[in-house]
UniProtKB/Swiss-Prot annotation:
Classification via PANTHER family: INDOLE-3-GLYCEROL-PHOSPHATE SYNTHASE (PTHR22854:SF2), TRYPTOPHAN BIOSYNTHESIS PROTEIN (PTHR22854)
Organism of derivation: Nautilia profundicola (strain ATCC BAA-1463 / DSM 18972 / AmH)
Catalytic activities: 1-(2-carboxyphenylamino)-1-deoxy-D-ribulose 5-phosphate + H(+) = (1S,2R)-1-C-(indol-3-yl)glycerol 3-phosphate + CO2 + H2O
Superkingdom of this protein's organism: Bacteria
Keywords (A to Z) from UniProt: Amino-acid biosynthesis, Aromatic amino acid biosynthesis, Decarboxylase, Lyase, Tryptophan biosynthesis
Pathway(s): Amino-acid biosynthesis; L-tryptophan biosynthesis; L-tryptophan from chorismate: step 4/5
UniProt GO BP: L-tryptophan biosynthetic process
GO molecular function: indole-3-glycerol-phosphate synthase activity; phosphoribosylanthranilate isomerase activity
EC supergroup of this enzyme: lyase
Chaperone is among the record's keywords: no
Name under which the protein is recorded: Indole-3-glycerol phosphate synthase
Family membership: Belongs to the TrpC family.
Gene3D superfamilies in the cross-refs: Aldolase class I (3.20.20.70)
SUPFAM superfamilies assigned: Ribulose-phoshate binding barrel
Length: 258
């Protein structure tokens, strides 16, 4: 399973980084946070919130954007998106924590460190690099580890996007107390899509949870359909990366024109 391979590589990388970096040094930095929940919660005047992703490649699709300039992409996103996701996993997604650090220098919108978080050290890195929220993947860890990392992130001031793929994951999210839950329509084992996942599981969530839809969102019709199911925000990467006019593509998914 691809997730197992990514986690194994992440552990290997972590061991190297932990030997040469001081965990507490990252957290000693004083910083402000951009308001993640305000950015992601749908409102009547902005019902379709977009988390636009800076993404060069993926295990299922290979290289998605050849002429990849993360800073230039981010400068377009900040004009039209509500938040931004930056892939920092280097081996399978060709991401980098350096992209996050650079984009943090100028972004007025909240930033997600999109990675395979399995250790407090990565959360400290995200904090120091300027992230406002991190991703925790329910499938990747047992519930006690998820709870420990969730609480650690919250205590540093970071928000958490808790990603689920099925009902078992949802139960983990409820146990952890997750207040921003992402429904990944793509099965991490088979890469197959289930666009009805959120429709099936949203009724089981507490009312105060912010709901994010991930994967397979390529047109405004899909956004409207998911919105009727109770989705607040839409995390979109590959679709935007394949467009010549990124700003126009974001606005189209928000149901707007330039």
């Amino acid at each position: 399973m691809i997730l197992d391979k990514i986690i194994a590589q992440t552990k290997k990388d972590l061991d190297n980084r932990k030997n040469s970096n001081d965990f507490n040094k990252f957290l000693a930095q004083k910083r402000d946070f951009r308001d993640v929940k305000k950015a992601l919660k749908a409102t009547p005047d902005n019902p379709y919130r977009i988390i636009a992703e800076v993404k060069k490649a993926s295990p299922s699709k290979g290289i998605i954007k050849e002429d990849f300039n993360p800073v230039e992409i981010a400068k377009e996103y900040i004009e039209v998106a509500d938040a931004m996701s930056i892939l920092t996993e280097p081996h399978f997604f060709q991401g980098s924590l350096e992209y996050l650090k650079e984009i943090n220098k100028f972004s007025p919108i909240p930033l997600l460190r999109k990675d395979f978080i399995i250790d407090e050290f990565q959360i400290a890195e995200a904090y120091a690099a300027g992230a406002d929220f991190i991703l925790l993947i329910a499938k990747a860890l047992d519930v006690s580890t998820l709870k420990r990392l969730y609480d650690f992130a919250k205590n540093t001031g970071l928000e958490v996007l808790f990603e689920i793929h099925d009902e078992e994951d949802l139960q983990k999210g409820l146990e952890v107390g997750a207040d921003i839950i992402g429904f990944n329509h793509r099965n991490l084992e088979t890469f197959e899509m289930d666009m009805d996942l959120s429709k099936k599981l949203i009724p089981k969530l507490p009312k105060n949870v912010i709901v994010v839809a991930e994967s397979g969102i390529n047109d405004f019709e899909t956004v409207k359909k998911l919105s009727r199911n109770g989705v607040d925000a839409y995390l979109v990467g590959e679709h935007f990366m394949r467009q010549d006019n990124i700003k126009k593509a974001v606005l189209t998914l928000k149901g707007k024109t330039e």
